[in-house]
Amino acid sequence: MTTLTITRPDDWHLHLRDGDVLTDTVRDSGRYNGRALIMPNLVPPVTTTEQALSYRERIQAENKSDSFAPLMSLYLTEKTTSEEIRKAKATGHIVAAKLYPAGATTNSDSGVSDIKKVYPILKTMQEEGMLLLIHGEVTTHDVDIFDREKTFLDTVLAPIVNDFPELKIVLEHITTKDAADFVKNAGPNVAATITAHHLLFNRNHMLVGGIKPHFYCLPILKRNTHQQALVEAATSGNPKFFLGTDSAPHAKDKKEAACGCAGSYTAHASIELYAEVFENEGKLENLEAFASFNGPDFYNLPRNTDTITLVKEAWIAPETMAFGNDFVVPIRAGEAVEWLVK
């Protein structure tokens, strides 16, 4: 039987939601992750230090794992102050601020419409060593949804990188060859997370033979040439790329609807799904760096010191999983996952 022991991984982009669903989402992500960076797009958004610390307390109240710890982020708005950034940084629990272009994804209506309005805040973040996380899509109606990421790179991200050369930036959940190339060619302060579902699937999986709503996420799945570029980047050993699931649960009826929500749930099997990708590429030896080393190294945090063991043993993912009083349909529902964490 094939086994693989790696340093305990971290998830550098995770949605846990809030309220009664935390019992389920914290359990799923806390099974084998050491840390997870929790996204702040609640309703209302997590815009202050007090809100972030309160959210952290609610997560910890449901955390049954001695090895799992949430790291928090602030939701960046045009009203965010430099004082708030400094206060957040001083807590030791809030490690980043998240830039959502207004309307780009779930609960992003409070996001930034004019990037220049937050330049003073980016300057403070650069000075304080607070990381900037970016949902890299434009949201103007004249840009096709499949082109939003590429346009963002050219019109928004490139100027930010140029104007703030010391600001550490993570381009979240990249979906295009353009984004992978941008990160590779940028300086050492620019990195990216990549999801398991963007490595395993492309837009054909979502659209051919009937619409599959559980593959619908933002940024949207792209064509297979972009998928292959992401796989190459993730499995290459390049330290600029690391694991961020963007596991984003919605209740089954909110996905299977005339106007369904964006987000795919992978927390039930995240490292197992990544292992499939790396095995398929013959690069299992690079999984540990992607999952366990590159993220903490970029964040200037210590690597985890304990390990987990994966076994090449197929199991069937559940058709549905508990999500508070509702159910969530996970990726690979009712289908085989090739690896299992022992």
Curated annotation (Swiss-Prot):
Keyword Zinc: yes
Cofactor(s) required, per the database record: Zn(2+)
Binding site for Zn(2+) 2: 98, 135, 173
Top-rank taxon: Bacteria
Ranges that cross the membrane: none
Pathway listed: Pyrimidine metabolism; UMP biosynthesis via de novo pathway; (S)-dihydroorotate from bicarbonate: step 3/3
Modified residues (N6-carboxylysine): 98
Protein family according to the UniProt entry: Belongs to the metallo-dependent hydrolases superfamily. DHOase family. Class II DHOase subfamily.
Subunit structure and binding partners: Homodimer.
Reported function: Catalyzes the reversible cyclization of carbamoyl aspartate to dihydroorotate.
PANTHER family according to UniProt: DIHYDROOROTASE (PTHR43137:SF1)
Name assigned to this protein: Dihydroorotase
Organism: Aliivibrio fischeri (strain MJ11) (Vibrio fischeri)
Taxonomic lineage of the native organism: Bacteria, Pseudomonadati, Pseudomonadota, Gammaproteobacteria, Vibrionales
